[in-house]
A protein has these predicted regions:
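Active-site helix/loop of acyl-thioester processing domains in fatty-acid/polyketide metabolism
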Residues: 55-80
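Hydrophobic beta-strand-centered segment that forms part of the acyl-chain substrate-binding groove
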Residues: 5, 71-107
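HotDog/MaoC-like acyl-thioester-processing domains
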Residues: 2, 37, 69, 101-104, ...
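Conserved positions in beta-strands of structured domains
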Residues: 26-29, 92, 97, 111-113, ...
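Catalytic strand-loop segment that frames the active site of acyl-thioester-processing enzymes
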Residues: 20-55
């Protein structure tokens, strides 16, 4: 059984193709067949922070990287293979209600709607202090390893 504590102990960099300074997720906090969650502290040196606020493009990238963390976890711990590159194929019904400030902790939940032929369709929700900041439907295309 996968516990939150065991997930939090995973170095997120092991799951993502992105590297600093473009890592937009902090810790993996939940994983099951359909749902993946991450937790991220907004830091002042983040490239999407302007005037102390984490911008809307950063929220979208955070959702995409939560999807990437899910794919990375499956590849590393279940399928025992390497990290795959993924690309945002589509963003639909994006709604940004607010943006977090430096020091805030955001929680991102991605729920898989469909996962077939290297394409993942998911709903993403970003919250902070119990308030929803962003919601979207996202499609991620995964490049097969060569």
């Amino acid at each position: 059984m996968v516990t939150e504590e065991s997930l939090r102990n995973i170095d997120i960099h092991e799951l993502l193709p992105q590297q600093e300074p473009f890592v937009m997720v902090g810790k993996l906090t939940a994983f099951d067949e359909k749902r993946t969650m991450t937790e991220t502290v907004i830091k002042e040196d983040n490239i999407f922070v302007f005037d102390g606020v984490f911008s809307a493009p950063g929220l979208v990238e955070n959702i995409a990287q939560t999807c990437a963390a899910r794919i990375g976890y499956v590849n590393k711990y279940i399928l025992k293979k390497g990290i795959q590159l993924g690309f945002i194929g589509a963003i639909r019904n994006l709604e940004i209600v607010g943006c977090p400030k430096v020091g805030d902790v955001i929680t991102t939940c991605v729920t898989v709607i469909d996962d077939v032929l290297g394409m993942t369709l998911a709903n993403g929700v970003v919250t902070c202090n119990g308030e929803t900041l962003a919601t979207t439907e996202i499609k991620i295309a995964v490049k097969e390893a060569e």
